[in-house]
Structure formats: C-alpha cells, structure tokens
Amino acid sequence: MIRVLSPFPDWLDLGGRTARPTQSDADILRARQQMVSEQLQVSARGITDPQVLKAMEKVPRHEFTPENVRAEAYDDTALSIGHGQTISQPFIVAFMTAQLQPQPEDRVLEIGTGSGYQAAVLAELVREVCTIEIVNPLAERARADLQRLGYNNVRVLSGDGH
C-alpha cells in the first residue's frame, strides 16, 4: 500500500511544554524522552499510538537541526533549517504520523523533505520512504544525514513534487 502524507490546518493549537537539552548524550536522550512524555502523550494532545511515540523517542531530532538551534531541538516549535524552510515541531510530526496510521509493510511518499526528520520517523514504522525536496541543498543535507544515521530504507530525491 502507498500512503501520501500531507500537512494539516494551521489553526490547530500547538501549545506545549519545552525541554532544552545540553550537549551531553545523556541529557539529549532525556530531553527526547521528555518531549514524548510531556508534549505528545498528554491527554489534551492525544498522541496515543505506542509505535508513533516509540519512533518519536528513538529518532534524534537534534541531528536534523543546524548547530545554531540544536539546543532548542526538543522544544515543541518549528526551527529554521535554512533556505526559508523549517523543521516541523515535534507535535506536528507525531500528529501527521499518527493520522497516517503507518503499517510495517507500507511504502510512503513524502513531498517536502526539509531536514529529513519526518522521513526518519516514518522510516522507523514502514518498509520504505521516498521523499522529495525541491530545494537541492536541503535534499543533499537530508540525504547525507539520513545515510549517516543508518536510515537505509529512505530514498531522498531532489525535485518538484508537484
């Protein structure tokens, strides 16, 4: 089955608590776990799919952010990744992923790779992800980051997904 992931309305309430990691691996891991427990699982936000929560906890969001905003990587906010683009806030990524209801045998097409973070989350849940980014430098950086992090089931294409 092929599923297409698309954005949702910008009117959704995106308020939430934040967790600022330091540079130590242990602190970053704690910040990622806190992101899941405090921003995504709280009843008002309603992310309940255990597989989605596990994927969000596993994927190192800080590895998909520029160095100058890395300390904010686990805040529930969009962050600039250059070229006028942003990495979506964690709640948005979790919400879209949960709405997709991914299955292990799925092949997913993502239009708008950005940093590659959403593709990495999806890659934890499905057989294959093909993602297309129109901004070539972002596609190249996402491809390199995904490969470096071992996401071999993600194919990054540079081009217009329209």
Regions found by a protein language model. Give the residues of each.
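Class I SAM-dependent transferase core
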Residues: 2-109, 125, 140, 148, ...
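Conserved nucleotide-cofactor-binding alpha/beta core module
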Residues: 101-162
